[in-house]
């Protein structure tokens, strides 16, 4: 296989961009980046029906140390193919998508140089085009095949236009907050009197404190890691990471803040912390966004990934009277399912993963952490005006008691096929034991337990890697361990499945 094709990771390009980690040679070289972006220009020209010379394509990046090098290659590739390049410098993934939408820009295509929360030596590219937004997996495969046939091209980029996209993006977020709160006392600075801290994890999200919250009157004293630093010296910029959540929780409590917001590196994900230190991530974040949307979309369908809790379903369906459509892992999967439902006449305002990727129909189905933060801030102001606190929106969501996740390694070349055999045998064994297999189910095998142990387990194949994730949730003392033991029994005896993780 051509090494360029190996850089595909779902609908993104991902690879090792700089040396610095043992046994991880550079795979996303400057030359490969150049050829891949050239291929994007050619692919976009064909798709849009425009000549390359008629295309205007924007490039943005996060704080990674390899970003300047990759940006230079991207700009040269665009110019070499005859298109007009725009340098947006430090930006966010959602902002790069919105550059196709804003009247001030309306570019023909854009790209974000990022590898989300991965280590400092990694990088990648996300591509956007106006018709479908983010590129689909098949389209990226086709584009990379074009790149395999190209050679590196050098071009003069000294006169490339520079545009401060993040400032335009921030202005639009400020407008949405002002309109959403519609304060009669202080329309321009509706967050006056609120203390809100941000943890940007040294990624690209620091602008939210400076260009959004502060502009709207909020006190952001105590915010963390707003300065971009591609070495990520403080913690992994990932709202799923315990150390990261501990940091923003500490910032909220130590500064007696009203709310804490935390973003990943490229700001397409977020989580939050209430004033009392309660974390609003995973199931709680999904519940919160659904509770915010329910007034405008009663009886609608919320699409989530597959690893959500039964307790979330009980809250969405029992308390909010919504429908919970538990689908698959992968933010593109949940977004595309949400689109499909709406196209078929099923009202679905939200597609969201436990990872913090959340996309709203009202916002172009764009997974945008900053936009979710905007919705949260508006909701906080409205609940405050009603004499309530933000926590009250999800106070009836039962907290998870105990959870565990295991990644069982698959050996051999054709790990996908072997994983499918494991799932088939696992299902048969579960039925023989009389376990309750949940249906409908759209990914892997989900088993619900009531009686000797209470909770659930989900075994599935990883989207890209040679392993099988197993998620377990127990509802009471000892339930998680009991369910895990039952899973271990069902998964014993497969010669290419490593279950030693259970013994660690």
Locations of the language-model features?
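An N-terminal, well-structured beta->alpha segment
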Residues: 1-74, 81, 158-193
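Conserved phosphate/anionic-ligand binding catalytic regions in large, soluble enzymes, centered on
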Residues: 5-22, 200, 204, 350-354, ...
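N-terminal small/polar loop signature for handling phosphorylated ligands or for N-terminal nucleophile
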Residues: 42, 46, 50, 56-122, ...
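Short glycine-rich phosphate-binding loop at a beta-alpha junction
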Residues: 49-62, 86, 195-197, 300-306, ...
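Proline/glycine-rich low-complexity loops and linkers
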Residues: 88-89, 93, 144-175, 274-354, ...
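Gly/Ser/Thr-enriched, mixed-charge loops and adjacent short helices
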Residues: 104, 121-252
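Phosphate-binding and adjacent anionic-ligand microenvironments
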Residues: 297-471, 476-504
